[in-house]
């Protein structure tokens, strides 16, 4: 399994959630990046407000750390309603979901993170709640058991997932607004780093912010985490200001290279290059070679490497691209 303290891990770790909450934008106009998604949301939200209706149910999907929870909170703020948050693994029984649904007020947002991990029993309860705003509850046991229907106020369910394909078709079909989040570009991440530095009362110049953004793997959560570590270095070893030189030295010390790779990324790429002659290599063999599981490779390591063109996923397996060889200053062997 992947190490919990991996600095460039996109999943929440340590105090990330608490610190990220302080840095989160509250409204769409404060939100940086994801331009198409933002433009769509503005239209959908304004239309719902004009009609005085609850916003349609929304599925937000994409790699971890890109702001799915932040967007859900922004939607609630823009609509002027409350938000109740939970996650798929927490909702073990139908009663867990029923307790949340019956406490919603009209227009409220129910946010379920990792919605692909809902149990089938809980998912069945969710269908009529999403479609008809009704909750079917079984009263009693055995032959005397009977079903009663409770009316729910109109509400908005926002589901978030890193694995949209793992959702069942009936559940996926009930979301009227599907939104895919993409990795951020360096310019948008630079803006995010600068904004976060201002929240932290940290002095940072443009080149320092760019250097952190370049090594953040297109992910705001990683950018904010790297910024905090660079701040530590700047305060202890320098005058507390973050310049390009300070950022470069601190991140090199943290073993995050100029592509945002750490030892595990390099281990994966070099395994394909050295152990499997550049590929193709099957996922199971690759997982065994680097001592990680399939899910870690597919959900955590691969997306960024594929998006940046270092790995190609083919029907026969994974292949290291020319860019991967160039990164390590290696010559790509010619295939027979």
UniProtKB/Swiss-Prot annotation:
Residues 4-184 are annotated as: Large ATPase domain (RuvB-L). It catalyses: ATP + H2O = ADP + phosphate + H(+). The keyword Hydrolase applies. CDD domains: AAA. Mg(2+) binds at residue 69. GO terms for molecular function: ATP binding; ATP hydrolysis activity; four-way junction DNA binding; four-way junction helicase activity. One of its GO terms (biological process) is DNA recombination. The keyword Transcription regulation does not apply. Keywords: ATP-binding, Cytoplasm, DNA damage, DNA recombination, DNA repair, DNA-binding, Hydrolase, Nucleotide-binding. DNA binds at residues 294, 313, 318. It holds the Pfam family RuvB_N. It comes from the Bacteria. Its main location: cytoplasm. GO terms for cellular component: cytoplasm; Holliday junction resolvase complex. NCBIfam families: PRK00080.1, ruvB. Homohexamer. Forms an RuvA(8)-RuvB(12)-Holliday junction (HJ) complex. HJ DNA is sandwiched between 2 RuvA tetramers; dsDNA enters through RuvA and exits via RuvB. An RuvB hexamer assembles on each DNA strand where it exits the tetramer. Each RuvB hexamer is contacted by two RuvA subunits (via domain III) on 2 adjacent RuvB subunits; this complex drives branch migration. In the full resolvosome a probable DNA-RuvA(4)-RuvB(12)-RuvC(2) complex forms which resolves the HJ. Belongs to the RuvB family. This is Holliday junction branch migration complex subunit RuvB. It comes from Shewanella frigidimarina (strain NCIMB 400). The gene is ruvB.
